[in-house]
């Protein structure tokens, strides 16, 4: 009787034969460790995609190495040419800003803002607000002009008043008096100077 078909009875004297024979069977570890294929892909397609993925990853690593080497070479050339880091930074910022300006997102945003601005300026509320502000400005200008005219008229009335004329006459009188005294003082200077020119008499001899 074959051992595979023996009765697995705990009370049977041959109860250890089946387990001993199963331990001798080799196990395929490769099959057990293999992951199941992705749903919808055959094993061949999966292997092909994995090979392509490995190739792309290797190309990415190579490109990064090439880029790093190019950047080092570029930095060395700039150093030898005397180009400062600040100049390179400005150039990079300028290039980045240009890239932003020509990007689709920036262009769409600018167009959207232009549309909003046009809608706002064409709206009735904006027009009414603009008209109100214009009218307020005109009223303010008219009020300032009226106030200036009133001040000028008031000053004219003050100059024509008796009080102002009396004050003006007093100022004129004081001015005339000051000028007259100054002229009289200048005329008296030669006489005093003339008396000073008189020669002194010789002292009497002892």
Curated annotation (Swiss-Prot):
The modification Phosphoserine is found at residues 3, 12, 19, 21, 96, 149, 161, 166, 192, 195. Residues 175-185 have a biased composition (Basic and acidic residues). Residues 1-24, 175-206 are annotated as: Disordered. Residues 1-14 have a biased composition (Polar residues). The modification N-acetylmethionine is found at residue 1. Transmembrane segments: none annotated. The modification Phosphothreonine is found at residues 163, 173. InterPro entries: TPD52 (IPR007327). It holds the Pfam family TPD52. Keywords: Acetylation, Coiled coil, Phosphoprotein. Belongs to the TPD52 family. This is Tumor protein D54. It comes from Pongo abelii (Sumatran orangutan). The gene is TPD52L2.
């Amino acid at each position: 009787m074959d051992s595979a078909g023996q009765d697995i009875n705990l009370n049977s004297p041959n109860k250890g034969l089946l387990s001993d024979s199963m331990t001798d069977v080799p196990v395929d570890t490769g099959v057990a460790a293999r992951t199941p294929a992705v749903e919808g892909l055959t094993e061949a397609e999966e292997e092909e995609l994995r090979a392509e993925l490995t190739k792309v990853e290797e190309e990415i690593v190579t490109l990064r190495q090439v880029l790093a080497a190019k950047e080092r070479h570029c930095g060395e050339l700039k150093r030898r040419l005397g180009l400062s880091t600040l100049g390179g930074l400005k150039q990079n910022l300028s290039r980045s800003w240009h890239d932003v300006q020509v990007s689709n997102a920036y262009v769409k945003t600018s167009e959207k803002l232009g549309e909003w601005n046009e809608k706002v300026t064409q709206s009735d509320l904006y027009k009414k607000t603009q008209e109100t502000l214009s009218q307020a400005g005109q009223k303010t200008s008219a009020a300032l002009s009226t106030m200036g005219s009133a001040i000028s008229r008031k000053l004219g009335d003050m100059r024509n008043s008796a009080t102002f004329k009396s004050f003006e006459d007093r100022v004129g009188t004081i001015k005339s008096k000051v000028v007259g005294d100054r002229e009289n003082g200048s005329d008296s200077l030669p006489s005093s100077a003339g008396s000073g020119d008189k020669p002194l008499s010789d002292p009497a001899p002892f």
